[in-house]
Amino acid sequence: MTGLEPGRHVIVEIATLITDDNLELIAEGPDLVIHQGPEALAEMDDFVTSMHTRNGLLEQIHASTITLEAAGAATMAFLQEHISEVRSVPLCGNSIGTDRRFLAQYLPEIENFLHYRSVDVSTIKELMKRWN
């Protein structure tokens, strides 16, 4: 993402992994870098610009020819290939509240395909910090 505010910032990469209940990898989906124009990239603050420059993502964004729509369609096809029942699988990851907001804003078909529940590992990290 180019920042943390849906509506102002945009998605620049989407990657998907499918795991079983024991978090064993079942399938690795496409890792897609989404082209964004100069107007969208101008919304990045210095921290995000520096991070995306250091890790090479900014260069990949410029070089990409993948649209958000194409990335969403490829991701949705991957999910449907591996998940037979709509809304049966939660979104899992780190600090995914932000991811959910961006999915709802830009890729609602993916947001609606996933279960409303989430597994956010940042919650586990915060609990471990407080309980230890």
Model-derived features: where do they sit?
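Short, well-ordered beta-to-alpha junction loops that form the rim of enzyme active sites
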Residues: 92-97
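Substrate-recognition/cap helix-loop segment adjacent to the acidic, metal-dependent catalytic center
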Residues: 82-83, 98-117
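Conserved non-catalytic scaffold segment of RNase H-like nuclease domains
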Residues: 2-91
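Amphipathic alpha-helical interface surfaces
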Residues: 67, 71-75, 88, 99, ...
